[in-house]
Amino acid sequence: MKLLVIGNGGREHALAWKLAQSPKVETVFVAPGNAGTAIEPKLQNIDLTAHQDLIEFCRKENIVFTVVGPEAPLAAGVVDDFRAAGLKIFGPTQYAAQLESSKDFAKAFMAKYNIPTAQYQTFENADAAHDYVNQKGAPIVIKADGLAAGKGVIVAMTLDEAHAAIDDMLLDNKMGNAGARVVIEDFLQGEEASFIVMVDGNNVLPMATSQDHKRLLDGDKGLNTGGMGAYSPAPVVTPVVYERAMNEIILPTVAGMKAEGHEFTGFLYAGLMIDQSGAPHTIEFNCRFGDPETQPIMSRLNSDLSDLVEAAIDGKLDSVTAEWSPQTAVGVVLAAQNYPETPKKGDVISGLDAANQVGKVFHAGTTANEKGDVLTNGGRVLCVVGLGDNVAQAKAKAYGALEKISFDGMQYRKDIADKAINR
């Protein structure tokens, strides 16, 4: 069968690569894809992004189903459009995707359904926001209401930082429409984890646990990014935390969306903050697989992903299980110079073949020129995954592979997975 994956990042490379491992799958088209998906066996890039063009392509090629990688097409209603055209697609509707595309929607939804999260208030007026922050004190978290590619969250450790973030979003319009409303919420202490599940509207199939590293620099310093690395499984998600996350967050969310008359289908990702007592709180929802969590998680999936997605689209997730490798996977992101602000593009990347002999290189912000050189083409350029019998081995494998790669201004964290090693 022929499948389609929408997107051009590392997450989409990993999803398409895993789907292509199925003996049932002939070709996975990736729209628009990157330099990695262009050369991966059984994968083929197509330069289409408009929903109608994609729908026509699916009809012409008899695509069995489509998987949506990134948040932007979901928020733009790609699932609604495909379903209206009678095509199978895995992802949430535009309404359901508001769990990610509007922080205010998500917080109000959590309050309504008693899902644990930080206390919050929403503001469109800068003066009112400044007053609220002065009353609450720091540390405090300022979030752009809309989609901001993972960079719309400012964890303000001082009042000055909080006031500056409010001005950036509400007065200086630095986030555009995404920051025209801000959600201000209490700062939560604890350790973060990514809890990702597949949902068919009613049933839930959990993916392996993982932990992302949001900050740019070692020791969780520097600016927030889309994610600088991840590992799976995440030891902070103990069996008790796992049960609580399912029963207090995931299942009430799925039931709540159904009660709202908008069943959630697709990947649902709860960003958790696990406090000292082991209680999980929801920091955010994403309506798709995480990036870079997808890369290590897919590296551990032994099941046929196409079977899981088909079951989910058909409302039969309760009839399948996911089998996981007992190994640990560590993925490290290589980012371009000046990421996350104004990443430099167009630098030649060398050493990819050598790196792929040691680990697995997933492409994100890459493109190829006429000569066949692979060039940087975005903020997060590559994610290098290593597998090992324990976290330390997997980390050594990932960094061993990464050392083969070079491009001008390459930056990466050297401490990915150290939290798990030091536990």
UniProtKB/Swiss-Prot annotation:
GO terms for biological process: 'de novo' IMP biosynthetic process; purine nucleobase biosynthetic process. Binds 1 Mg(2+) or Mn(2+) ion per subunit. Mg(2+) binds at residues 284, 286. Signal peptide: none annotated. PROSITE patterns: ATP_GRASP, GARS. Its EC number is 6.3.4.13. ATP binds at residues 133-194. Pathway: Purine metabolism; IMP biosynthesis via de novo pathway; N(1)-(5-phospho-D-ribosyl)glycinamide from 5-phospho-alpha-D-ribose 1-diphosphate: step 2/2. One of its GO terms (molecular function) is metal ion binding. It catalyses: 5-phospho-beta-D-ribosylamine + glycine + ATP = N(1)-(5-phospho-beta-D-ribosyl)glycinamide + ADP + phosphate + H(+). This is Phosphoribosylamine--glycine ligase. The lineage of its organism: Bacteria, Pseudomonadati, Pseudomonadota, Betaproteobacteria, Neisseriales.
